[in-house]
């Protein structure tokens, strides 16, 4: 086995272990934020939505800067620094009793993510061969789902005692992750050339095809982020207990572990990437529309199942397509910019979703936010269809098995 092949194989295992630690640290804390501050402390949902939207926008919106800096200086220093910064954000969140302190903690957490997320994504593109990326992204997403359940279970259990324990656990996990990277991650360069920060950013911004694709995905993310805001609140409202939220993530884990890899393996040889992405988005949009009209957990969990199945179909295709479109001369910059759709869509989804949720309650129209999200999903579906029908993306990137 050549040294390059050996590095790729070892890199896969490193990426899987690193991803599990990050997912556990994140999901111990974030699914419980809306329950802690809306249901337990009585804050308006829009206040928590601002905090979550701020974290999302800082992490993903500034990702191009984090990626460009990583292109210049390498992945390791950015990843370690970012993970320590997120640990500090979680520690601050544990003592948040005013909105401004929650917002500050989410700002720190998002800034940390800006530093570590793009280089971690670029490492996947660097280490995994193009023909294997779809399946590897599926493995990462299966891991995400399992980690989400374990993290949510642990966080829900700790929340019975003290929210500070929840935040401390998340902080400790990110400190461990920083140490793991500092110890084992080689000083790899992300790009094929040592790209200056400004040049990497310029290269991305001049790629109109990639920019259009990324911005179109903002609507997709407005739906996707509700697993952190409105869906946990809805489950808690109907069940009357925050403990029920863990079952929402258990559903996601079961569906992901049983369906994600087989669907990706079966569909990658039969359907183009954009068709898989659009099909998943359509299922997600349809499942959103009736959520505000359900009256029991069985109906709600059925719709959540449909939503997750749509995500299982769409996510591997979305990640693979984003990676395929990245220029090897500026991988960090491309993977950083690819998060801008999540920054915009996530911020609008959190803040707008929280505002619509409060408005729906005030007007006695609980279906309002869900109907709006479904409509946004359909508009995004049509926009993606228009984009791909005009062949703005090279055919070789989209063919099955590409």
Curated annotation (Swiss-Prot):
Transmembrane segments: 13-33, 99-116, 139-159, 165-185, 214-234, 244-264, 277-297, 300-320, 340-360, 368-388
Keyword Transmembrane carried by entry: yes
Intracellular or extracellular location(s): Cell inner membrane
Keyword Lipoprotein annotated: no
A Pfam family per the record: MFS_1
Keywords: Cell inner membrane, Cell membrane, Membrane, Transmembrane, Transmembrane helix, Transport
Source organism, top-level taxon: Bacteria
Entry-linked PROSITE patterns: MFS
One GO CC term on file: plasma membrane
MF terms (GO), sorted A to Z: transmembrane transporter activity
Side Cytoplasmic, residues: 1-12, 117-138, 186-213, 265-276, 321-339, 389-402
Membrane topology: Multi-pass membrane protein
Parts of the chain on the Periplasmic side: 34-98, 160-164, 235-243, 298-299, 361-367
Family stated for the protein in its record: Belongs to the major facilitator superfamily. DHA1 family. MdtH (TC 2.A.1.2.21) subfamily.
Name of this protein: Multidrug resistance protein MdtH
Gene: mdtH
């Amino acid at each position: 086995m050549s040294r390059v092949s050996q590095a790729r194989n070892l890199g896969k295992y490193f990426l899987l272990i690193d991803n599990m630690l990050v997912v556990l640290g994140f999901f111990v804390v974030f699914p419980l934020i809306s329950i802690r501050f809306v249901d337990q402390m009585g804050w308006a949902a829009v206040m928590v939505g601002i905090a979550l939207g701020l974290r999302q926008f800082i992490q993903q919106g500034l990702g191009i800067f984090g990626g460009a800096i990583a292109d210049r200086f390498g992945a390791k220093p950015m990843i370690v620094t970012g993970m320590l910064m997120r640990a500090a954000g979680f520690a601050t969140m544990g003592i948040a009793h005013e909105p401004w302190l929650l917002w500050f903690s989410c700002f720190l957490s998002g800034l940390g993510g800006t530093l570590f997320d793009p280089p971690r994504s670029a490492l996947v593109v660097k280490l995994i061969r193009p023909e294997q990326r779809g399946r590897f992204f599926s493995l990462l997403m299966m891991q995400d789902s399992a980690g989400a359940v374990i993290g949510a279970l642990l966080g829900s259990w700790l929340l019975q005692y003290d929210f500070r324990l929840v935040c401390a656990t998340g902080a400790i996990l990110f400190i461990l992750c920083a140490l793991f990277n500092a110890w084992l991650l080689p000083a790899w360069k992300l790009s094929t050339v040592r790209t200056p920060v400004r040049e990497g950013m310029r290269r991305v911004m001049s790629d109109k095809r990639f920019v259009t694709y990324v911005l179109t995905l903002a609507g997709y993310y407005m739906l996707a982020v509700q697993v952190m805001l409105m869906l946990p609140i809805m489950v808690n409202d109907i069940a009357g207990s925050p403990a029920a939220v863990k079952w929402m993530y258990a559903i996601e884990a079961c569906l992901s572990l049983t369906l994600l890899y087989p669907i990706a393996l079966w569909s990658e040889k039969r359907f183009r990437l954009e068709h898989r992405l659009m099909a998943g988005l359509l299922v997600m949009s349809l499942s959103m529309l009736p959520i505000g009209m359900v009256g029991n957990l069985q109906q709600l969990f059925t719709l959540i199942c449909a939503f997750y199945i749509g995500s299982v179909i769409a996510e591997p295709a979305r990640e693979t397509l984003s990676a395929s479109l990245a220029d090897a001369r500026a991988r960090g910059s491309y993977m950083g910019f690819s998060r801008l759709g999540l920054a915009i869509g996530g911020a609008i989804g959190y803040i707008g979703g929280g505002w619509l949720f409060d408005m729906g309650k005030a007007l006695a129209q609980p279906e309002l936010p869900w109907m709006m999200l479904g409509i946004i999903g359909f508009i995004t579906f049509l926009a993606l269809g228009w984009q791909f029908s005009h062949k703005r993306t090279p055919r070789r990137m989209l063919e099955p098995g590409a």
